[in-house]
Amino acid sequence: MRMLAKADIRRRLQPLAPLPTGLTPRGALRAPVRSVLFDVYGTLFISASGDIDAARNRMSGRSGLEILLRKHHIARSATEVLQDLYAAVEAAHAATKKSGVQHPEVDIVRIWQAVTGLDSRSRAKDFAVEFEIIANPVYPMPHLPVVLKYLVEKNVAMGIISNAQFYTPLLFDWFFDAEPEGLGFRPDLLFFSYRFGRAKPSPVLFESAARVLNQTGV
């Protein structure tokens, strides 16, 4: 099976609109602002699912997963696969917590290989990407390119701290034909949870960011 092409992925991406928060902006930043660290889901990109429980409800009746399973020749029902997916994630979390990690992050590719029985990591990555598009549709927040361009022009150091998997950084390429670094994010200020095996609210990601900012005089 060939790897997913960006054009194939883009055909499945649909526009989304953000929901109003119902909150009134207040407070003011203290100048000068020298760095901005963003989250991804719900900040840079609109996320339709919101959280894992919402994703479970969203997927439970979706025919998209059944189609995906047939495409990858997996002779199981969507319900069975979803049950095994969430059980595998919870088991991985529990095992890691026993080693003293309070807020673990899973390797979703390894999880999918175990759940689906796919024989290679590349096939499991393709499956993970397609599942994510079905389970958690995303779309850039309004005016995102304008905001990033403004911060770049003002020499504001931009970074990301996000609960994420390997496909999260790919969002920038899918929508903007650029990696995060190409849009002005500093490579040393990209803190994706899957790279650390730790998820927010673990202080590990924030402490790593603070260390880099201190070392570079920001």
Residue spans of the language-model regions?
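Charged catalytic carboxylate motif
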Residues: 64, 143, 205
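Short, flexible/disordered intra-domain loops and linkers
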Residues: 48-60, 98-102, 169-177
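Short, acidic loop-to-helix structural element flanking the phosphoryl-transfer center
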Residues: 101-110, 118-121, 132-160, 168
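Short helix-terminating capping/connector loops at secondary-structure junctions
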Residues: 30-31, 121-123, 151-153, 181-187, ...
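A metal-dependent, Asp-based hydrolase signature
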Residues: 63-129
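Surface-exposed alpha-helical segments enriched in charged/polar residues
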Residues: 66-70, 145-149, 153, 211
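Active-site neighborhood of HAD-like aspartate-dependent phosphohydrolases
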Residues: 2-9, 14-15, 20-83
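Substrate-recognition "cap/lid" segment bordering the active-site pocket of phosphatases
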Residues: 139, 159-161, 165-218
